């Protein structure tokens, strides 16, 4: 009978299985990390009360064709729903867009830029590292734009990849697409069309391409970007724009 009792005792060590509940708590941060990896979202539980939504545009802007997995990309099908949600959410009063992109698909980049430009809420862009190629229209689409002192922006003509049909219509299509980019940039910034095209078709700046590599202060001098600054100035400016958009309170009204 004693042996029978000893056989029952080994079942007791199974009680320490309760600590297995701890990984469930650790699983919450993993969900946030997975969301950041997949969608590039910066929202974490501590920022739920913030009235400013931040969107990052990094790597290569992916178009209708999926890029290789080793490429770090920004997918327009992820960015556009975030912009729509920010526009509809009453708790979000401003939008901060941070760019460090090499460019990418022209139509996808213009789609994002048009969405940003047509938002009713205050928007501010900040170029860190680089805002090259089709990243330029996105950078100038906001109400106010900043660029880091060491950041650069490459301005070059539109290019095609893959099979190209050598007919006059192809070059006409390229010219029209390029005019869309030029028109958008000059409309939403202080740079003139002549100056922008001069930078775009410059032959002595880039080694293996036509165009110009514009550094922080030069981008402001040309009128492409509004101001040189970092995250502090960008947040301060966005807060000012939010306060200006808010309706004034009636005189004599008590505010807490």
UniProtKB/Swiss-Prot annotation:
Pfam families: CLP_protease. InterPro entries: ClpP/crotonase-like_dom_sf (IPR029045), ClpP/TepA (IPR023562). One of its GO terms (cellular component) is cytoplasm. The keyword Acetylation does not apply. Keywords: Cytoplasm, Hydrolase, Protease, Protein transport, Translocation, Transport. It is found in: Cytoplasm. Residues 11-26 have a biased composition (Low complexity). Gene3D superfamilies: 2-enoyl-CoA Hydratase, Chain A, domain 1. The active site is at 133 (nucleophile), 156. This is Translocation-enhancing protein TepA. It comes from Halalkalibacterium halodurans (strain ATCC BAA-125 / DSM 18197 / FERM 7344 / JCM 9153 / C-125) (Bacillus halodurans). The lineage of its organism: Bacteria, Bacillati, Bacillota, Bacilli, Bacillales. The gene is tepA.
């Amino acid at each position: 009978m004693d042996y029978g009792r000893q056989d029952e005792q080994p079942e007791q060590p199974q009680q320490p299985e309760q600590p297995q509940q701890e990984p469930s708590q650790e699983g919450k941060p993993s969900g946030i990390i997975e969301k950041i990896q997949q969608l590039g979202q910066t929202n974490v539980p501590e920022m739920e009360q913030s009235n400013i939504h931040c969107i990052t545009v990094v790597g290569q802007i992916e178009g209708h064709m999926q890029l290789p997995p080793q490429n770090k990309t920004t997918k327009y099908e992820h960015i556009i729903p975030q912009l729509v949600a920010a526009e509809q959410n009453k708790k979000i009063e401003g939008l901060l867009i941070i760019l460090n992109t090499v460019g990418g698909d022209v139509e996808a980049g213009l789609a994002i830029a048009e969405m940003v430009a047509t938002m009713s809420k205050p928007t501010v862009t900040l170029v860190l590292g680089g805002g090259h190629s089709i990243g330029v229209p996105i950078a100038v689409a906001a109400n106010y734009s900043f660029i880091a002192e060491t950041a650069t922006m490459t301005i070059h003509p539109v290019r095609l990849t893959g099979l190209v049909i050598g007919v006059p219509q192809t070059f006409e299509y390229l010219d029209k697409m390029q005019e869309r980019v030029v028109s958008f940039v000059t409309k939403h910034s202080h740079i003139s069309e002549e100056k922008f095209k001069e930078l775009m078709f410059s032959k002595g700046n880039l080694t293996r391409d036509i165009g110009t590599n514009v550094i922080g202060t030069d981008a402001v001098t040309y009128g492409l970007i509004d101001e040189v600054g970092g995250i502090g100035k960008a947040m301060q400016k966005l807060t000012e724009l939010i306060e200006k958009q808010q309706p004034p309170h009636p005189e004599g009204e008590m505010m807490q």
